[in-house]
């Protein structure tokens, strides 16, 4: 295998497994006092939780509120992408006009770069669209279970694309997640609240999340490794690609007939949803920066648990013991997978390389 193939294989492996270089994190942790770093981590994690949970509840309102009655999920997603593009361009202009005010890269739409990002944009559209469609057809309480197969797809794609085998214990945690998913589907059906359409969209969203991680790593060099440039091009491409979908699905006609089209409250909620969509990318990166990818996964799992409890309380739903068991299986399996992968990566890092051993033996 040549150097280029090895590099591509490493990139795909990092994308699927969520690994990163721990040396930078270790150095950063040594620079600041423990109390200050702990406070920063607590604030960043809290910001991530508030932003993520608020975005889910707000999107549920926009997509499936009885008081709103807006049946245009593609338009809602399109508008959120448009808000992100405008925010990126606005921050870029501010950074250019007032240096030092905000740290943001200069953004200029380059069609060549846009074409390079296009494969990722197609996957990105699938990810955010299927996410919103899943949320439209299922309750917030079941939303995490409906989208719980991302880890399973990560393992599957790592084998299909990298021929990377997974340890027995990691596969065991995946089987717990799958078991929790099917138990959740069964219990939703028993309670008469199951939407097979929403469940299918959740599975497709999970697949797209895994593919998005792969393509993000592959496309980053085209935007000089800048996440903000990638966000700008990704959402700009999405806005263009959404237009034929809006026409084909008749959502523009439905929007023109919407009674609250001229309501300031409606557009305020739509814009707020776009702001949360923009912010979640930033706070996710911030949480990974101040902790690690593995800690981010643990935080996401705990956040999902809190979100489920809040949804049940807010919507005043009564859930069976087996329904809660399915959620605990999904969350527990996800946490266990993160823990197993963390131990395996730590063990791999601690093991000396064969060539180093040979060299030391020769020196002796």
Curated annotation (Swiss-Prot):
Domain of life (superkingdom): Eukaryota
Coiled coil: none
Annotated keywords: Golgi apparatus, Membrane, Sugar transport, Transmembrane, Transmembrane helix, Transport
Predominant place of localization: Golgi
GO biological process: GDP-fucose import into Golgi lumen
GO CC annotations on file: Golgi apparatus; Golgi membrane
Acetylation in keyword set: no
Designated name of the protein: GDP-fucose transporter 1
Organism from which the protein derives: Bos taurus
Gene it is expressed from: SLC35C1
